Amino acid sequence: GVDVKFLTPDQVKEIWPLCNTSDLLGAIQHPEDGYIQPADLTQAMATGARNRGAEIYRNTAVVGIKQTKEGWIVETDKGAIECEHVISCSGNFARQTGKMVGLDIPVIPVEHQYIVTEAHPDILKRKKEGLPEMGVLRDSDSRWYMREEAGGLILGPYEDGAPACYVDGPSKDSEYELFQEDLDRLAPHIEGAIHRVPAFGEVGVKKVYNGAICYTPDGNPIVGPAWGLKNFWINEGHSFGIT
């Protein structure tokens, strides 16, 4: 049911002028696909929830979850909240949340790196001419994605065997924590990216980010009612985003 278009190499070049199409047979385009800044999406969803009567408690740690005959009691460092339903959507803390109610939620955070380059003259020229931003480009053979970012490019690899982190859950002080980058792990992806998009190799690297991202054993998120618990719902392990 996904709306896709099959493109010829010439059509790929028209949509992504910086792409080397000399060895391509074709491509698949998702016309309605896109990306959104996570902070903007979070604020929009929070605003929508508040408009519908929800209350959001920021900087409030959950220290325990207890089941009762009527529902649940969520214990926090600022008091207890009684409720009928609980939804676990705690990201890197999924395993810790599960342990509070006796669940082993199979979600493990692993290190994920991505590279941000300096601005490229061709991209700046496109912006100046008012041309649309090139969409997200994915190369399945070299296992990476790429898109524009502030006049430059972002390269994100799909690494094999990326190191696990926070196996027992992150500490309470781990918010926004980043790890040491490892460019050796990225070398095959960088090589493939330069072949497919030569412009990527023509500019300097502005920053390499290495942070935690959640994965499940099969790569799919876990969404739905928890096994063996009434009115406890799970929404964990989304890895690369919301579909």
Where are these regions (language model features)?
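Dinucleotide-binding Rossmann-like beta1-alpha1 core, especially the glycine-rich loop
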Residues: 1-15, 141-146, 151-152
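A short alpha-helix-loop-beta-strand transition element characteristic
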Residues: 1-11, 21, 104-107, 202
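Helix-loop-beta segment of a Rossmann-like dinucleotide-binding subdomain
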Residues: 6, 16-52, 170-177, 230-233
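Short loop/edge segments at beta-strand edges and connector loops
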Residues: 8, 58-60, 207
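A short, glycine/Asx- and small/polar-enriched loop/turn
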Residues: 18-24, 66-73, 215-219, 228-229
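Helical element adjacent to the flavin cofactor pocket in flavoenzyme catalytic cores
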Residues: 28-85, 89, 93-96
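Central helical "cap/lid" subdomain
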Residues: 80-133
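Active-site lid/adjacent beta-loop-alpha segment flanking the redox-cofactor pocket in flavoenzymes
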Residues: 103-104, 120-232, 236-238
